[in-house]
């Protein structure tokens, strides 16, 4: 906070990234009509991808798909908008040329959106086909078949998303070298404060050996 109050350019740059990410996410997160539109679009595209993969589903509600008696609801978190907003905030929140901004958009938006559809297809198929009915004591919640959803959604998909986002961030660093400069400056800025918290100085007694 103290660096922000001093208008430190490095912290102001980080604030710009956060602001850009929020401005991208906010319309979908806080305007129900836009959020529902995005959810419906992702649900329809996920259904089409499932049908093309040989696992057709039925809609029991506008955003809920059913197969083999197992229902999966698509919510805003299933659309990938959070990841898109964060990564576009990173890509657009640093000084760059128009060409770099376009390249960042083309790298981030279609890649995350398409892979998010693939993620939904994997989770729904794994759940409805009961691919991973393992360790119910750990993964179960009392609902029949939930274990497959847990392993597919909470473990495999999350781990895959983490690996992918790291790779995407690396690609952004190649397109926008300014990100590397910002990351290094932020590391140097906060390293000393973290060290002071983790290794506080011992109080001096006034006695010398």
Task: Locate predicted features.
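Hydrophobic N-terminal alpha-helices or hydrophobic patches in metabolic proteins across all domains
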Residues: 1-209
């Amino acid at each position: 906070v103290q660096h922000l109050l001093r208008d430190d350019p490095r912290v102001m740059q980080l604030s710009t990234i956060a602001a850009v990410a929020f401005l991208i996410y906010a319309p979908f997160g806080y305007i129900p009509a836009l959020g529902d539109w995005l959810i419906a679009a992702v649900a329809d595209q996920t259904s089409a991808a499932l049908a093309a993969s040989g696992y057709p589903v039925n809609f029991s509600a506008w955003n809920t798909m059913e197969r083999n008696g197992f229902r999966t609801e698509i919510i805003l978190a299933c659309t990938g908008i959070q990841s898109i907003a964060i990564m576009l905030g990173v890509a657009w929140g640093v000084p760059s040329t128009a060409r770099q901004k376009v390249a960042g958009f083309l790298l981030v938006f279609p890649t995350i959106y398409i892979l998010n559809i693939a993620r939904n297809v994997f989770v729904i198929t794994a759940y409805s086909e009961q691919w991973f009915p393992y360790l119910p004591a750990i993964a179960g919640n009392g609902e029949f078949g939930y274990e497959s959803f847990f392993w597919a959604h909470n473990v495999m998909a999350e781990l895959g998303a983490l690996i992918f986002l790291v790779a995407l961030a690396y690609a952004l660093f190649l397109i926008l070298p300014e990100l590397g400069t910002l990351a290094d400056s932020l590391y140097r800025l906060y390293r000393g404060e973290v060290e002071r918290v983790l290794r506080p100085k011992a109080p001096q007694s006034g006695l010398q050996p």
